[in-house]
A protein has these predicted regions:
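Ligand-binding clefts of soluble mixed alpha/beta catalytic domains
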Residues: 1-538
């Protein structure tokens, strides 16, 4: 394949300005992640007094040292619900994809160092997303749990949808994907069913507590008086009730047992041998990705400058470039994995939509994964665009994206507006994974445009009623609307709302995409031995 010849002036003022802005954006979200870590660390004395490890210490013992670990949705729920100061982001869950005894797994740990690991609406949403990732990518699930259960302040938002988590667990087991849970502390009410639906359960002696109704509720409901240990302690569940398969002496021992369980599973042995991969690094350093995207989002740039820094050897086979240059399609390899790319150089034209739809079908035909790089204001509007059939061709593109069965990866590197977000496989079109650069924006439209639209609509409404709208009121309406949409379109707002699986430093993009493509390739090759019911205890 031909190599892209970069035209980026890495010594120019624009590059320096772009780089500075991107570095500030990266530092901003890293600082927020550190605040969450610092908040959890404040609980260390309490955990040490109880003879327990902090959640991240448990996770560190669980994962293979030195192996890659991809944390997911670290800033989910940032400043939402009870997270007033931004130190409780993460949805009460630390989660990601990493290796345990050489097996790639989906791992999750209750962040009991913050609010006892109670489940918020964000925490539930994150849990459901993690389960979706496990099912789509055939990843064993290992959970380290210690949670006070649902945050009752949000019971109405959690209760009904919470059942999906249990249903997903049953389906994961029925698919033939193992689930291992270590109980480090309390896991009551709904949390108890999370354990019961796991295939392997490890309980920590003297710490694990599992029951449907705790001592206070039990006394209120039935008059029975029992201690939490008598009601649902680790020994009861391991020796009498049979809910647990293994009894651990402490946190570290529980994690050790989880590693041994995963290690004894013939998970990797069931995977057909795959050819060894080799690749060449891009001709241009990934460090330069910091300066590719203009600090001013209104300035255009060529998405191929990003491709040149993530593709093996910077090689890219451009598809129908002469037909439409604003929607870029073509073939490349990332760390040896072939994939088809769709990127934006501005709005999606009718021709670009038709081109992309055709390219997606070709990738589906050849079983080639798809990568979407977002930087679009949406579909081209206007009378000429309508005459050219933008609705017809745009619908065709969305139809192709929605029905493509090959793995789809999405990386938002700039703007992602309107139906362009849908056509480029945004969250609602179910990409296998979706990540965003910290400079990116996602919204139905720009704030300024939204403000002007509401102003015009309000003026016309008053005119129909024979009235004249107050100019000051219109100014305020336009300003407030623009500010609201702008604040809700930032990368931070999007990741807090779980519109993506996390923010990524542009310099890590190539490594991230290579890792994700490898996960997808392994999932496509892996056979599963499922059943119609899952594994139940008798």
């Amino acid at each position: 394949m031909p190599a892209i010849q970069s035209e980026l002036d890495v010594n120019g003022e624009d590059f320096a300005r772009n780089r500075e802005a991107m570095l500030a954006a990266v530092a901003g979200f890293r600082e927020l992640e550190q605040k969450v870590l610092d908040k959890a660390a404040e609980a260390r004395p309490k955990f040490e007094k109880r003879g327990q490890l902090l959640p991240r210490e448990r996770l560190a013992l669980l994962l293979d040292p030195g192996a890659p670990f991809l944390e997911l949705s670290s800033l989910a729920g940032y400043k939402l619900h009870d997270d007033k100061d931004g130190t409780q982001a993460g949805g009460g869950i630390i989660a990601g994809i990493g290796y345990i005894a050489g097996v790639r797994c989906l791992v999750s740990a209750s962040n009991s160092a913050i609010k006892g690991g109670t489940i918020s609406p964000t925490g539930l949403k994150k849990t459901l997303r993690l389960q979706q990732i496990a099912m789509e990518n055939k990843l064993p699930v290992v959970t380290l749990t210690e949670s006070g259960g649902a945050n009752l302040n949000y019971a109405a938002e959690i209760f009904v949808e919470g059942a999906r988590g249990f249903a997903n667990q049953a389906r994961i087991s029925a698919m033939g994907i193992p689930q291992v849970t270590v109980v480090h502390g309390s896991s009551t009410a709904g949390g108890a069913y999370q354990l019961g639906l796991s295939d392997y359960v490890v309980v920590v002696r003297g710490k694990a507590k599992m029951f449907l109704a705790g001592p206070p509720l039990l006394k209120a409901a039935t008059g029975e008086i029992a201690s939490d240990e008598e009601l649902g302690g680790a020994e009861l569940h391991a020796q009498v009730a049979g809910t647990a398969e293994y009894l651990a002496e402490n946190d570290a021992d529980g994690v050790r047992l989880a590693r041994e369980i995963v290690g004894m599973l013939p998970w990797n042995a069931q995977l057909p041998a795959r050819p060894a991969r080799s690749w060449r690094e891009p001709l241009y350093p990934v460090e330069e990705l910091l300066g590719v995207v203009p600090a001013d989002p209104k300035k255009p740039y060529d998405v191929r400058e990003i491709v040149a820094r993530i593709a093996d050897g910077s090689e890219f086979l451009d598809f129908k470039n002469e037909f439409d240059g604003q929607t870029v399609c073509g073939h490349l390899r990332i760390e040896g994995h072939a994939c088809g790319l769709i990127g934006n150089n501005g709005p999606i034209t009718p021709q670009g939509a038709a081109k992309a739809a055709q390219f997606i079908q070709l990738c589906e035909q050849s079983n080639t994964p798809l990568l979407f790089l977002h930087n679009t204001t949406g579909f081209m509007v206007g009378t000429e665009s309508e005459r050219q059939g933008v609705i017809k061709h745009g619908s065709k593109m969305i139809q192709a994206v929605a029905n493509a069965r090959v793995p789809k990866l999405t990386l938002v590197v700039g703007g992602s507006y309107g139906a362009g977000n849908y056509a480029m496989c945004g969250r609602g079109l179910d990409p296998r994974f979706i990540f965003a650069w910290p400079n990116s924006r996602t919204a139905v439209m720009g704030g300024a445009q939204a403000g002007k639209v509401l102003r015009i609509v309000t003026e016309e409404k008053h005119a129909k009623e024979g009235k004249e709208a107050d100019p000051k009121m219109l100014d305020m309406l336009e300003t407030v609307t623009a500010q609201k949409l702008d604040s809700q379109s930032t990368a931070l707002y999007g990741t807090a709302s779980l519109w993506d699986d996390g923010l990524v430093d542009p310099r890590d993009s190539r490594r991230l995409l290579g890792y994700l493509l490898d996960i997808c390739a392994e999932a496509e090759a892996r056979p599963l031995k499922g059943n119609s019911f899952g594994v139940a205890r008798f």
